[in-house]
Swiss-Prot record:
GO molecular function annotation: chlorophyll binding
Entry annotated with the keyword Cell division: no
Subunit-level organization: The LHC complex of chromophytic algae is composed of fucoxanthin, chlorophyll A and C bound non-covalently by fucoxanthin chlorophyll proteins (FCPs). The ratio of pigments in this LHC is; fucoxanthin: chlorophyll C: chlorophyll A; (0.6-1): (0.1-0.3): (1).
Family designation: Belongs to the fucoxanthin chlorophyll protein family.
Protein name listed in UniProt: Fucoxanthin-chlorophyll a-c binding protein, chloroplastic
Organism encoding this protein: Chattonella marina var. antiqua (Red tide flagellate)
PANTHER family xref list: CHLOROPHYLL A/B BINDING PROTEIN (PTHR21649)
GO cellular component: chloroplast thylakoid membrane
Statement: the UniProt record of this protein carries the keyword NAD: no
Amino acid sequence: MFYSAAVAALMVGSASAFLAPAQFNSVAKSSGALSMKLGSSAEGLIGSDLELPEFDPLGFTNNPAPGALEWYRAAELKHGRVAMLAALGQLVQSFYHLPDPVFSESAKPWQALVKVCNERPLAAVQIGLAIFACEAIGQANQAKPGQAAGDLGWDPLNLRGSNEEIFERAQLRELKNGRLAMIAITAMIVQENLTGYGVIEAYRENAINPFGDGKGFF
């Protein structure tokens, strides 16, 4: 089925998200995207000292290899940013579609993606190429000397400004929203596959109680 091939292509296109952490060995610590004071633990790393300080049940920060923490943070930021776009897209597509029947016949986001991949294979190829281009450009920027983890050198709105304290708060908001979005988009996909309802569709059909109403999973 074309959908399986398309998913495989998209995975290859985003493979640089999992490049070995050794690439960060030569990257000097800077405050470009994260004010990090890293040693052999996450102490001082933005986002590691709130709610559950030093929360690391899997031990990623226990004597990591050189450059590993930067790699972990870059991967976390990348996935968080993608998840924020994905979660927003799940909601937007319930209200707006491109003027093509293949985009507008399903209210279920995941089902719509499968339909697009099967009926508009070139659209899936375009998605894959766009992902590859973003990864290649981002990787080139990330590899610059002195570039901090997650700093892609792209700030068209000049959000960084000149106040480091304000910028660190903005970084923390991005990190926490990204973490929440990763949980949210996972829950949205699970909900759709278990109940048959997308997020907005569930509210429209009053299918918001998962227990005993004949519409939820239980």
